Regions:
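Phosphate-binding glycine-rich loops and their immediate beta-loop-alpha structural context
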Residues: 87-136
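SH3/SH3-like beta-barrel fold
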Residues: 13-18, 26, 47
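Beta-strand/loop nucleic-acid-binding surfaces
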Residues: 22-37
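Short, Lys/Arg- and Gly-enriched loop/turn segments at beta-strand edges
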Residues: 52-62, 90-92
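A conserved segment at the C-terminal end of the G1
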Residues: 172-188
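Helix-rich effector regions associated with P-loop NTPase G domains
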Residues: 11, 35-53, 63-79, 102, ...
Length: 295
């Protein structure tokens, strides 16, 4: 039988069988320990049922992974949905840009969702849309409270495993609840079996939103690591800089203080957004300081 690990805790792996709409509490066979392979949330696995009534089984095989993240340790994530509020609270652009850098480093596609659009004016939404769509990101505005554009989010999730991230207070939990609203009762009972409560999850967990779509809410995506690489790499994680690659006066220009920099020229002409560039500069300086401390 085949299923997907939707949660792992204390050596137990909860395997969701999409055919049966059932979850089995499984242990991994000893062969995995011997081969130093650890099952991960998101893994597609083969398993055998030990007790159908009790819902227990053993994982016998882990199918090949198409991707693997280290922080958090999850497999087969297709994309990330980052959720911020348009207002109340206003977007923390530096936090958003750090998240985007982290995803660019992992070569993962990102969809940006700005929630609470019902509380914002047209000017606010237009500015956010212009800033991030010009960088190549898809931007969707939603209202979990009024259930606006939820179907557009569902279309983005279709057939994928999506990591959902965002700071507290932006309506992320309400959005996830909206996405789960229309799933059938059998799938809905899954969350009860693995004791998913209203509290903040402390373990990576996949939540089925239909038979071939999952979302993952995890605390790991709140801890953003943007200082474990060289400062020269940073520019490649800002997509809007790429069209100017090779056009600056100096080869290897970092777009900071070098003369003849075409990125800074684009900034002055309004073709690159100031908030994005300022966040780039802040991250660059942090990496620079870390490098100095190292030596």
């Amino acid at each position: 039988m085949q299923g997907r690990i939707i949660k792992g805790i204390a050596g137990f792996y909860y395997v969701y069988d999409v055919v049966e709409f059932a979850v089995y509490e499984c242990k991994a066979k000893g062969i995995f320990r011997k081969e130093k392979i650890k099952p991960l949330v998101g893994d597609l696995v083969e398993y055998e049922v030990l007790d159908k009534e009790e819902g227990t089984g053993n994982i016998t095989k882990i199918l090949p992974r198409k991707s693997e993240l280290i922080r958090p340790a999850v497999a087969n994530i297709d994309q990330a949905l980052v959720v911020f509020a348009v207002t109340k609270p206003k977007p923390h652009f530096n936090l958003l840009d750090r998240f985007l850098v982290m995803m660019e480093r992992q070569e993962m596609s990102v969809v940006i969702c700005f929630n609470k659009q019902d509380l914002a004016g047209e000017e606010e939404t237009a500015e956010l849309k212009a800033t991030y769509e010009s960088c190549g990101y898809r931007v969707i505005f939603t209202s979990a409270y009024k259930e606006e554009n939820i179907q557009e989010i569902k279309a983005v999730l279709k057939g994928k495993i999506t990591a959902v991230a965002g700071p507290s207070g932006v309506g992320k939990s309400s959005l996830i609840n909206c996405l789960q609203e229309n799933i059938n009762m059998e799938t809905g009972s899954i969350s009860r079996k693995i004791e998913r409560g209203k509290h903040t999850t402390r373990h990576s967990e996949l939540i089925p939103v239909d038979e071939d779509s999952y979302i993952m809410d995890t605390p790991g995506f709140s801890s953003l690591y943007t200082n474990d690489f060289e400062k020269e790499e940073l520019k490649s994680y800002f997509p809007e800089f790429r069209e100017y690659e090779g056009t600056c006066r100096f080869l290897g220009c970092n777009h900071v203080s070098e003369p003849g920099c075409m990125v800074k020229n684009a900034l002055e002409e309004g073709n690159i957004h100031r908030t994005r560039y300022d966040d780039y500069l802040e991250m660059y300086r942090e990496l620079e300081q870390k490098e100095k401390r190292r030596y």
